Amino acid sequence: VNAGELRCLIGPNGAGKTTMMDIITGKTRPDTGTCWFGASINLLQMSEPEIAQAGIGRKFQKPTVFEHHSVFENLELSMAGPKGVWRTLRARLDADQRQRIEDVLELIGLQDESQRQAGALSHGQKQWLEIGMLLMQNPLLLLVDEPAAGMTHQEMDRTVELLTSLAGDHSVVVVEHDMDFVRALSSRVTVLHQGSVLAEGNMDQVQNDPKVVEVYLGE
């Protein structure tokens, strides 16, 4: 995956998509092989926190936000570092920190919901908030797991816009089963099967690949 690229990852259940993200983020250690971030960072020699600090952020399928805190506070907590929840919320934000939060709120489309409790947001809004929480940590690479699951069509369209806007400033890898959503992202697509790359290309190339039709899209 190139710097600033948006890449979609598809494949049947058990193809290795989640395992790949687990290895990249340090949650799972492979028995053999290598895993490099850029040309010089060996992820297999790093802990999960070290990998996050190196610039890799992951958004799981189910949103994990602080439901009893406001949208603004969720973003504030995401840049807490070692201070902890209560010390962070009691501390004064400087002008740069406040502007950073405002910028992310605008990017994820929640500027009008900033004082709303996160638990009161729609499913799609929670997904956007969690992406915003990752952005507060200035990641170089974002791993996004099935963002379209459970979304309305309107939320899916907005999510396509959001993920597309992130490419360039960040590398973004999206794991997704919804082929209409993948097509809307207009990105390069990698197909995994049994832990290996089966095919790569744009959506038309992948959909017309006989191997892909046989093991995945023809199901």
Go through the PLM ranges and name each one.
Residues 10-12:
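The feature captures the beta-strand-to-loop junction immediately N-terminal to the Walker
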Residues 25:
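Helix-to-loop junction immediately C-terminal to a conserved catalytic motif
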Residues 34-54:
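ABC ATPase NBD Q-loop/coupling interface
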Residues 44-45, 104-120, 125:
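Conserved ABC nucleotide-binding domain
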Residues 88-113, 140, 161:
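Conserved ABC ATPase "signature" region
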Residues 142-146:
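Catalytic Walker B motif of ABC-type/P-loop ATPase nucleotide-binding domains
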Residues 156-168:
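Helical segment within the ABC ATPase nucleotide-binding domain
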